[in-house]
Amino acid sequence: MDKIREKLSNLKLEAESWQEKYEELKEKNKDLEQENVEKENQIKSLTVKNQQLEDEIEKLEAGLSDSKQTEQDNVEKENQIKSLTVKNHQLEEEIEKLEAELAESKQLSEDSHHLQSNNDNFSKKNQQLEEDLEESDTKLKETTEKLRESDLKADQLERRVAALEEQREEWERKNEELTVKYEDAKKELDEIAASLENL
């Protein structure tokens, strides 16, 4: 019984710890989900910008092949292409970074759900142990009541045996008294019979 109570107490403490962690992660997960939405929107926006830059780069590169363009125009367009290429590369890096952060956030969200599952399992185990403990308490009370009834019956039997022993001792005493009286009466009769014979 004490072991069950101790195990139940430990599980309650562990369940409370899991619950606290779950509440913390739940709040953090809520923030992460909001961040995920914002990052997904940023990724979409950056992807659109990236596509626009690529389209502009293609147009500029196509313009370079036009023989009618002056050399100065070509130089300017090449510089624009380089600048746009750098921006495009920066956008791609930012998109990759946001995607990595998004993946990490989703993993944390999954961990939060896993923690909730663990918390539910502990709650079920805790409930089962409480039911087992309640059942054990009921059985213990029933056993204690039966033992009490047995003790009462034993006391009654002991008193009955003691009373019977007293009755037996009383009958033995009376029997001894009757035996003595019988012997005395027999002796007296023998003496009377002897006196009659002498007459």
Swiss-Prot record:
Residues 68-80, 102-114, 136-147 have a biased composition (Basic and acidic residues). GO terms for molecular function: actin filament binding; actin lateral binding. One of its GO terms (cellular component) is actin filament bundle. There is a cross-link at residues 39, 59, 187 (Glycyl lysine isopeptide (Lys-Gly) (interchain with G-Cter in ubiquitin)). Residues 59-81, 102-147 are annotated as: Disordered. It comes from the Eukaryota. It is found in: Cytoplasm, Cytoskeleton. One of its GO terms (biological process) is pseudohyphal growth. It holds the Pfam family Tropomyosin. The keyword Ribosomal protein does not apply. Residues 115-126 have a biased composition (Polar residues). Residues 1-199 form a coiled coil. Gene3D superfamilies: 1.20.5.340. Keywords: Coiled coil, Cytoplasm, Cytoskeleton, Isopeptide bond, Phosphoprotein, Repeat, Ubl conjugation. The modification Phosphoserine is found at residue 195. Present with 3060 molecules/cell in log phase SD medium. Homodimer. The molecule is in a coiled coil structure that is formed by 2 polypeptide chains. The sequence exhibits a prominent seven-residues periodicity. This is Tropomyosin-1.
